[in-house]
């Protein structure tokens, strides 16, 4: 009797192990995945937390979101193989690939491969109405928060101000901390390049009367001439409650990238999970409205991961996929 019971237990244990193995993704996949996201209070952070939950369910392996300073830190972590997935803006990715950004120290970062388009990053400026700031030009001599030093805004906004001949006092930091600072009147304005609605802008507007400072047509032209990677961008009216007309600005596109060493079938499964669950992605953040296959053509800089390229080919996406 004891022998029969022991055999039954062994069989049940074997079935359990096999079942767990089947539930843990493919045998040649990593045991876990980590996504490099951004600062708390930012779009990358919210998007990444939700994406990690989605992929954990769909891939049957634990996927974690890691808070970072943004694209520059994400690219460095990916190159060092400390994370396997990351969010980048294509402008910063271009600097990394070519080793041209000051932050690269001349080093080329080429471990990243494009997987899927995320959304446009419009640059947005906001001040409290009581500040008396009426335009971007008025930011001279004002205290302006621009997010983490390694984020897209932290890289680009100092250049914007130089090009536009505006001289504010710049403060970097996590978006949640900067939002507290402007709420306490320790800052005069915030400038951000992020998917709209930007979480901290929306939160501030719920408690304060705010003003969105639009770039003039001349300023848009000056920025695009100096920084050709910038495109024209529009934040639609109604994105924020007090934004009653379209907000014209410049922007960069965001992409999710993967380490080139990730298995092709895993990256294929990631693309499938994201595109097949668009409604859930939209619930994570409204900016995911642009996380659709057709927008893969927005990437003209990075090679696509072979697994992602196979997904676009199989799904008959229109366009040319840049691969290795």
Model-derived features: positions:
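N-terminal (or domain-start) structured segment
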Residues: 25-95, 104
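Extracytoplasmic
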Residues: 30, 42, 60, 70-73, ...
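Bilobed "Venus flytrap"/periplasmic-binding protein-like clamshell domains
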Residues: 32-58, 62-63, 121-184, 278-279, ...
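Structural recognition of the beta-strand scaffold that forms the well-ordered cores
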Residues: 64, 86-89, 124-126, 145-146, ...
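Acidic, polar ligand-binding/catalytic clefts
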Residues: 83-119, 195-198
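Pocket-lining segment of extracytoplasmic ligand-binding domains
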Residues: 90-92, 101-102, 131, 167-257, ...
């Amino acid at each position: 009797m004891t022998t029969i019971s022991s055999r039954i237990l062994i069989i049940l244990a074997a079935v359990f192990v096999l079942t767990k193995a089947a539930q843990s993704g493919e045998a040649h996949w990593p045991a876990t995945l980590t996504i490099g996201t951004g600062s708390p209070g930012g779009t990358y952070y919210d998007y990444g937390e939700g994406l990690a939950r989605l992929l954990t369910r769909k891939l049957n392996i634990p996927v974690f979101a890691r808070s970072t300073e943004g694209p520059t830190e994400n690219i460095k972590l990916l190159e060092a193989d400390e994370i396997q997935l990351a969010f980048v803006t294509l402008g910063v990715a271009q600097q990394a690939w070519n080793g041209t950004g000051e932050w690269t120290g001349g080093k080329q970062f080429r471990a990243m491969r494009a997987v899927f388009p995320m959304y446009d990053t419009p640059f947005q400026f906001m001040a409290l109405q009581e500040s008396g700031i009426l335009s971007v030009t008025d930011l001279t001599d004002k205290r302006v928060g621009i997010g983490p030093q390694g984020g897209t805004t932290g890289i680009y906004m100092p250049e914007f101000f130089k090009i536009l001949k505006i001289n504010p006092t710049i403060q970097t930091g996590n978006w949640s901390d900067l939002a507290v600072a402007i709420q306490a009147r320790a800052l005069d304005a915030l400038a951000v390049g992020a998917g709209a609605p930007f979480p901290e802008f929306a939160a501030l507007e719920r408690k304060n009367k705010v003003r969105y400072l639009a770039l003039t047509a001349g300023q848009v032209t000056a920025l695009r001439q100096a920084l050709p990677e910038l495109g024209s961008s529009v934040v639609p009216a109604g994105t924020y409650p007090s934004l009653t007309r379209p907000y014209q600005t410049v922007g960069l596109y965001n992409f999710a990238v993967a380490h080139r060493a990730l298995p092709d079938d895993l990256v294929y499964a990631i693309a499938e999970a994201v595109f097949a669950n668009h409604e859930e992605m939209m619930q994570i953040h409204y900016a995911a409205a642009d996380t659709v296959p057709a927008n893969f053509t927005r990437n003209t800089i990075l090679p696509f991961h072979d697994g992602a390229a196979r997904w676009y080919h199989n799904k008959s996406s229109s366009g040319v996929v840049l691969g290795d």
